[in-house]
Amino acid sequence: MKFSIIYEAQMVDTSRENEARCFHEIIEQAVLAEEMGFDTVWAVEHTALTQYAHMSAPETFLAFLAGKTTRLGIGHGVVCLPPAMNHPVKVAERIATLDILSNGRVHFGMGKGGTQQEAGTFGYDLGELQPMIDESMYLIPKIMVQDEIEHDGAHIRIPRRPIHPKPYQDPHPPLYMACTRADALTTAGARGIGALVLGFAGPDDIASKNAIYRAAWASRRAEDQVGFRPTEHLAALCPALVLDDREKARKIGLRGQRFFVESLGYWYQGGPKPTVEDLSGDEQAAILQQEKAAVVAYLSEEKISIGTEHTGAYEEVQDAYGTPKDCIRYVQRLFDAGADEILFLFQMGAVPHEAIMETIRNIGTHVIPHFRAQAELAAQ
């Protein structure tokens, strides 16, 4: 059972002052997360997606974070692999250097980026990227392991060269793929790497995705393995806000997730710009229910699980917005569905820094110890 946080560097106010404040607040949150027992902080990589994600240089952010921490895992979730965006030689060099400086704390996720806005920034059409991504995905671990690399592929050509340094972890850090659609889960399992399920999947959907991933893993072939370190691992995204005041957590958290979904829809589907209306938790949930279907179906053919009521019954806890007990019940459902790691998403829209800090403290004080004690009992 792993407990982590993933960051987009999302913001409503995109002024220089607020942008700088946002990054420093994220570092403060991540340092607290280490103190409270979280396992890893993951950073996405997106370019030119105003408001939705300003985390465009995760290698710099994660290197800075590594210097501020000693135990916390350092996760790329994920590095975009189009060669003009991130050449495989440079990716291998950066990952290895970060792994050395962090004393072996790196987790390396790979993907392509999800919008034409990003692909077009680097001269690509989104639809042409997958063969390049596949070629780079197989190539990077070889660069990190072999004394010399030479490659003459369809999209990438490298003359024989020694590439340095080599990672701290032997043979290399654990590898993952960004997975929202079923075919990506099948690919991750078949290639013997971890799956980062980055869509807003509820427990039922996580269970079905887990079944797809585990089946592909069980039938994988040695010749399809990416890298030299098989990693069977499924991490599930979990938007959350955990406060002592349940209604406050629901109001702020659901408003944040609504902004997240709307800003995602703006860049992925050309929808309207996101809003930060100050509504009650039930009102936010009702609007989110109306908006979610088209956006999420476009991304991953799934539904966002957002409940409009909390009665305290295990079966009816549909999200992690509420008290520590609410969060425990929902996280238990994700673990029961097959998740190995919870990717908490706190930093959404206008969710204030103070609420995120309280959430990290509450999860570290109540949620993580609950599950760690549970795991210790099961191991006896």
Question: What does each of the following model-derived ranges do?
Answer:
Residues 52-76, 132, 136, 360-376:
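Alpha-helix-loop-beta-strand connector modules within alpha/beta enzyme cores
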Residues 1-76, 170-173:
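N-terminal beta1-alpha1-beta2 module of alpha/beta enzyme domains
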Residues 20-25, 83-97, 319-327:
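Glycine-rich anion/phosphate-binding loops
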Residues 5-7, 130-163, 204-339, 374-380:
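An alpha-helical appendage that flanks or caps ligand/catalytic pockets
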Residues 3-7, 41-43, 74-76, 106-110, ...:
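Hydrophobic faces of well-ordered beta-strands that scaffold small-molecule active sites
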Residues 84-196, 203-231:
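Internal, glycine-rich beta/alpha segment that forms the wall or movable "lid"
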Residues 37, 45, 65, 98, ...:
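Conserved, mostly hydrophobic/aromatic
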Residues 40-65, 80-82, 114, 118, ...:
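Glycine-rich, proline-tolerant flexible connector loops at the mouths of alpha/beta enzymes
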